[in-house]
Amino acid sequence: MEPLDQTPGFPLSPEPNYWYETTPSLLLVSYPHLLDISSNQSTQSVPFQGSSALLTAVIYITVFVVGLTGNTLAIYVVLRYAGMKTVTNIYILNLAVADELYIVGLPFLATQNVLSYWPFGSFLCRVVMTADSMNQFTSIFCLTVMSIDRYLAVVHPIRSTKWRHPRVAKVVSAAVWAVSFVVVLPVVIFSDVQVRPSRPLQVGTSSKCLVKRVQETFNSCNMIWPEPKNVWSTAFILYTAMVGFFGPLLIICLCYLLIVIKVRHRMSAAQVGAVVSTCPLNICCLSRR
């Protein structure tokens, strides 16, 4: 009998849906006993992919431990000491809480990366996706509010006194969280476990004719859009880009531009640079999130 052709996409049976496909990472996790009969091409690529997934998981766990510790300490300090409850620190507190939402979801993402599928079900998929999106938008909106607060403190120091108060900062923070949740409603509605149709997985060798068929099901936590999917996906990308990046970026740049215009005639160049030194930092944080 002739050896099986290892060319991807070559049909191994007359049935139209039975196609050969090399999936070494999935075999390594779900069907390790089949690696002995896989092709040389597959066995050579498995250690690399397995090591890559393991390294990514280690990085995720490291970020989880360090981030959880640091953000928890920041939250504790602001809540524990009354003198720390300033307007700026209240916004920083909300940034730390938003980061904790993302950090708590890292073990789930690391597990999906190692196993190459989502094993936690639909509910946790929606929770993790929502927490991740809430982190992004809440952090961005908090940075924007902090820029507005800086603008009020520098340009309108007297008139803004009644607005720059911890009680007002708490109300603004609550509004930021509410707006963020409204913004991420598409994620809450459309995130789910995506299940690809089961199909036979066929493995052969060049030395002998050997075929084993295994039913493969690949689950991933993702956004599942209604038809037409391309239109929904593109609209969501544009929507998040405008609301979560370009809009806040415009407000932040405008605030610091007005600050520069206000103080440039009253301060030296070095002092002006000190006042606006946090603007590039805010923009970098905005682009990172």
UniProtKB/Swiss-Prot annotation:
GO terms for biological process: cellular response to glucocorticoid stimulus; regulation of insulin secretion. Residues 1-57, 111-126, 192-240 are extracellular. The chain crosses the membrane at residues 58-79, 90-110, 127-148, 171-191, 241-261. PROSITE patterns: G_PROTEIN_RECEP_F1_1, G_PROTEIN_RECEP_F1_2. Glycans are attached at residue 40. It is a multi-pass membrane protein. Keywords: Cell membrane, Disulfide bond, G-protein coupled receptor, Glycoprotein, Membrane, Receptor, Transducer, Transmembrane, Transmembrane helix. Residues 80-89, 149-170, 262-289 are cytoplasmic. One of its GO terms (molecular function) is somatostatin receptor activity. Its main location: membrane. One of its GO terms (cellular component) is plasma membrane. The keyword Glycoprotein applies. Disulfide bonds join 125-221. It is found in: Cell membrane. Belongs to the G-protein coupled receptor 1 family. This is Somatostatin-like receptor F_48D10.1. It comes from Takifugu rubripes (Japanese pufferfish).
